[in-house]
């Protein structure tokens, strides 16, 4: 497995390249390996699996300190546009966002550190996204930003 920095601008966000194997039995996708998970996230407290329909936009979600969380995301069915927004006020990239298409046919995963809001739009008829989170859900620290309030091209025709 290889990991690489998403871009020079967002040098804390990483793209992971794992294994995606197809044969007559179906598909095997390994997006990240154990030691790398611990290096990136420190711990894994939650595993989320979310299935959504075409044109759905989920997000932009985050948790404030001291319950901020990092995430590792991959798509196991369909195709999504995954978006991350820097909400760290003292960051050079504060208020800027990046995006990456993730789909079931690739071997990619995306690591998003604490201090970023996260969301995605569904580009295929349906999509299933799986992600690991470094902390537990904390309603008192939970926050969201309306994804349509920002100038982000979600690549969907009729957002749901």
Provide a role label for each language-model segment.
Residues 1-105, 126, 133-160:
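Non-catalytic, conserved peripheral segments adjacent to functional cores
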Residues 102-125:
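Conserved metal-binding segment of the jelly-roll/cupin
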């Amino acid at each position: 497995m290889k990991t690489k920095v998403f871009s020079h601008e967002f040098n804390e966000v990483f793209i992971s390249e794992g294994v995606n194997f197809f044969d007559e039995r179906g598909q095997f996708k390994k997006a990240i390996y154990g030691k790398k998970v611990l290096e990136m996230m420190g711990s894994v407290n939650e595993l989320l699996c979310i299935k959504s329909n075409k044109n759905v936009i989920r997000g932009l979600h985050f948790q404030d300190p001291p319950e901020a969380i990092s995430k590792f995301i991959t798509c196991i069915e369909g195709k999504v546009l995954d978006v991350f927004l820097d909400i760290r006020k003292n960051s050079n990239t504060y208020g800027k966002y990046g995006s990456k298409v993730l789909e079931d046919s690739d071997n990619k995963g995306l690591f998003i550190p604490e201090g970023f809001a996260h969301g995605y739009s569904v580009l295929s008829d349906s999509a299933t996204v799986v992600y690991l989170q470094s902390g537990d859900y904390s309603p008192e620290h939970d926050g969201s930003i309306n994804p349509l309030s920002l100038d982000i091209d979600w690549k969907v025709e009729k957002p749901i």
